[in-house]
């Protein structure tokens, strides 16, 4: 994926009064994202690695989190790429019911202390992410994160079910769902 020149022209034309900030460890973050993705078998080819680089995920995360310590920056980067992989999976899933079942496996991987190496790579990866999150987040933050995580999966399932049924909700319905 490459970004078209017209995109950069539009971005450069925006008058942004704040100084641009970027975490200084963007290259390190990209290497961490790729290494973690390989470790969890989320990428197997150089083409897939190139795709991750082309998405500029590390740059996005580094720009949005310019002041964080490396471990927390890494955790945010890994969660970000994990959600991209989950979204890609929906292009190949056989049914909404299969996706709902998969979401239940994801949720169990974040609440049960068992090894998930025999399951789908996204399941073992989310278990790893949840363990890492516990190192940096207290119990209240974990509960809030989990609640937001469940809501995100619910919205994901709703959007996929709409797409599968070829339903395009109006703006008010879409906004109401995203707020609930």
Show the residue positions of the predicted features.
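Alpha-helical, largely C-terminal catalytic domains
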Residues: 1-180
